Amino acid sequence: LSTAALAFGGAPTSPSGALTESWNGPNWAETGDLSTGRALLGGAGTTAAALAFGGEPSPTATEEFNTGVVVGAWSTGGDLNTARRGLRGAGTQTAGLAFGGAIPPGNTLVANTEAYNGTNWTEVNDLNTARQNLGNAGTQTSALTFGGGPSATAATELWNGTNWTEVNNLNVARRRLAGAGADNTSALAFNGLPPSGGETESWNGTNWTAVNAMNSYRYALTGVGTQTAALGFGGHGASNKTCLLYT
């Protein structure tokens, strides 16, 4: 929801890459830091129960965030099977999904997908196209991924809980973009590289349609929420600390 979000990690990895902040609608507030600061990580879950995984310099590490303590705290979870950065995630802390990315330090692209049960990661069926810095939306059983790199792509794939299926492409090819959406039938894709003027596209389960653009261009940002109530924050470019609401 656009009135509740959690931001964690990012570049530079020291000292700011461990910072965690909680969004309540009008304001951000600092809460408990990640145990390991990192950038290019994946995430899933909610403001009360989040999941952080992969990234650099700890490409297999998983941490779980819970608000059962005074300010919220991260604890160690099960490691990813495939070390990677630039991956994306979907789902919850106890039913998560990690996909795509690149293996450091050589930046070998991977299509690997892993499912998390709250304790361990299990390898499941791969993406059709290996890529990193891709867009993401959905749950462990109903996810969508789109765009990515290293060369900007418009490719979109739909996850049904078992397999990834290639579906209709984005209208604008891009990488290092953000996404939001409840499942694989409704999602938003916004901003990214190459400079696109902040284009936003809406997914209806079959096709992408251009809708209102973001107020400022940026890339490597984070997106959360649903197709009708999304939040974009962070990233590189103009006003990179500003949160933007889409309704």
Task: Please place each PLM-identified region on the residue numbering.
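A detector of repeated loop/turn-to-beta-strand junctions in beta-rich toroidal repeat architectures
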Residues: 2, 15-17, 38, 58-59, ...
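Conserved small/polar residues in nucleotide/adenosyl-binding loops
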Residues: 246-247
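A short helix->beta-strand "capping" segment at the edge of beta-propeller domains
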Residues: 72-74
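Short glycine-/Asp-/Thr-/Trp-enriched loop segments that recur within the blades
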Residues: 35-41, 80-87, 128-134, 171-177, ...
